[in-house]
Swiss-Prot record:
Glycosylated sites: N66, N302, N328
Topology of this chain in the membrane: Single-pass type II membrane protein
Reaction equations catalysed: a beta-D-galactosyl-(1->4)-N-acetyl-beta-D-glucosaminyl derivative + GDP-beta-L-fucose = an alpha-L-Fuc-(1->2)-beta-D-Gal-(1->4)-beta-D-GlcNAc derivative + GDP + H(+); a ganglioside GA1 + GDP-beta-L-fucose = a ganglioside Fuc-GA1 + GDP + H(+); a beta-D-Gal-(1->3)-beta-D-GlcNAc-(1->3)-beta-D-Gal-(1->4)-beta-D-Glc-(1<->1')-Cer(d18:1(4E)) + GDP-beta-L-fucose = alpha-L-fucosyl-(1->2)- beta-D-galactosyl-(1->3)-N-acetyl-beta-D-glucosaminyl-(1->3)-beta-D-galactosyl-(1->4)-beta-D-glucosyl-(1<->1')-N-acylsphing-4-enine + GDP + H(+); a neolactoside nLc4Cer(d18:1(4E)) + GDP-beta-L-fucose = a neolactoside IV(2)-alpha-Fuc-nLc4Cer(d18:1(4E)) + GDP + H(+)
Biological-process GO terms, alphabetical: carbohydrate metabolic process; fucosylation; lipid metabolic process; olfactory bulb development; positive regulation of cell-matrix adhesion; positive regulation of endothelial cell migration; positive regulation of endothelial cell-matrix adhesion via fibronectin; positive regulation of sprouting angiogenesis
Protein name, entry field: Galactoside alpha-(1,2)-fucosyltransferase 1
This protein's pathway: Protein modification; protein glycosylation
Highest rank taxon of the organism: Eukaryota
GO molecular function, one term: galactoside 2-alpha-L-fucosyltransferase activity
């Protein structure tokens, strides 16, 4: 009986291999077969909203900051292979991940991330998109598409089964209709969340020693932006006057707030942010090579003050609550405004405080 059983096992193994090969073939070439999944099926309540910068508002985009009504997901209908180049720093890659996920779902495609993006984000978040093996990446007949930084109608009807996206998208107009799913993807690992909450639990207001009632995360972007903004983009970073006004905005609206300051320029913050009221804590470590500790702190706060940059955007987006941001931080003729649309960058309910552009006028004088 042994030869018969052995033969049966071999036949069963061959059958499994054949079925697996057929399944893989159908997944890769599913786009060649009629599946009839248009936008009317994916999102039957699809609405277009006219916007001054041609922003395409996706179905289910919530009007209030803490709700979400995503399009129905049809996991079984996903076909093809989409990915995105991982480029830039931590916040850039978060934007690329969220945009890839949203656009792939909208177009009925399977999204994959490349190993470099997985290495950047997986140690921090519970991300779920599968990783594309390098050998598959190198052999796939990609069409490449560079995205601009706001959702456009043409992005909702991309017919390419093998698409590699690029660019630095970080606009709520791509993914806000999936807000709860995005927040789930960017859930901190337990040890990072617990460490951040432990830091916040130890904070006390300086004058009274009382526990704070409200935690306001403050992210001050400095570093390379000190040169890039004025020299390349004719813009500024947040100064001490802006931060003082933003903090006063929260002091007027929230009882006993404490401001948890993080930055890649902590020395400047200690010298230029007024901490005399006892409600400012310089908590960030400013380590750009390992930014997740600062990021975790910011997301565990109730509200956010941001200056510029994708790191601050994502901290505010995940924290929820009120957000104050630096508005109009470039001159009107800046080339930056060709690639950056404020309406698409900042949620409508966020509060903007205009930047002081006088240093730029001084630089422009002969």
């Amino acid at each position: 009986m042994w030869p018969l059983s052995h033969r049966h096992l071999c036949l069963a193994f061959l059958l499994v291999c054949v079925l697996s090969a057929i399944s893989f073939f159908l997944h890769i070439h599913q786009d060649s077969f009629p599946h009839g999944l248009g936008l009317s099926v994916l999102c039957p309540d699809r609405r277009l909203v006219t916007h001054p910068v041609a922003i395409f508002c996706l179905p289910g985009t919530p009007m209030s900051p803490n709700t979400s009504s995503p399009c129905p997901q049809h996991a079984a209908s996903l076909s093809g292979t989409w990915t995105i180049y991982p480029d830039g720093r931590f916040g850039n890659q978060m934007g690329q991940y969220a945009t890839l996920l949203a656009l792939a779902q909208l177009n009925g495609r399977q999204a994959f991330i490349l190993p470099a993006m997985h290495a950047a984000l997986a140690p921090v978040f519970r991300i779920t998109l599968p990783v594309l093996a390098p050998e598959v990446d190198s052999r796939t007949p990609w069409r490449e598409l560079r995205l601009h930084d706001w959702m456009s109608e043409e992005y909702a009807d991309l017919g390419d089964p093998f698409l590699k996206l690029s660019g630095f998208p970080c606009s709520w107009t791509f993914f806000h209709h999936l807000r709860e799913q995005i927040r789930s993807e960017f859930t901190l690992h337990d040890h990072l969340r617990e460490e951040a909450q432990s830091v916040l639990r130890r904070l006390h207001l300086g004058r009274s020693g009382d526990r704070p009632r409200t935690f306001v995360g403050v992210h001050v972007r400095r570093g390379d932006y000190l040169q890039v903004m004025p020299q390349r983009w004719r813009g500024v970073v947040g100064n001490s006057a802006y931060l003082r006004e933003a903090m006063d905005w929260f002091r007027a609206r929230h009882e006993a707030p404490v401001f948890v300051v993080t930055s890649n320029g902590m020395e400047w913050c200690r010298e230029n942010i007024d901490a005399s009221k006892g409600d400012v804590v310089f908590a960030g470590d400013g380590q750009e090579a390992s930014p997740w500790k600062d990021f975790a702190l910011l997301t565990q706060c109730n509200h956010t003050i941001m200056t510029i940059g994708t790191f601050g955007f994502w901290a505010a987006y995940l924290a929820g609550g009120d957000t104050v941001y630096l508005a109009n931080f470039t001159l009107p003729d800046s080339e930056f405004l060709k690639i950056f649309k404020p309406e698409a960058a900042f949620l409508p309910e966020w509060v903007g405080i205009n930047a002081d552009l006088s240093p730029l006028w001084t630089l422009a004088e002969p």
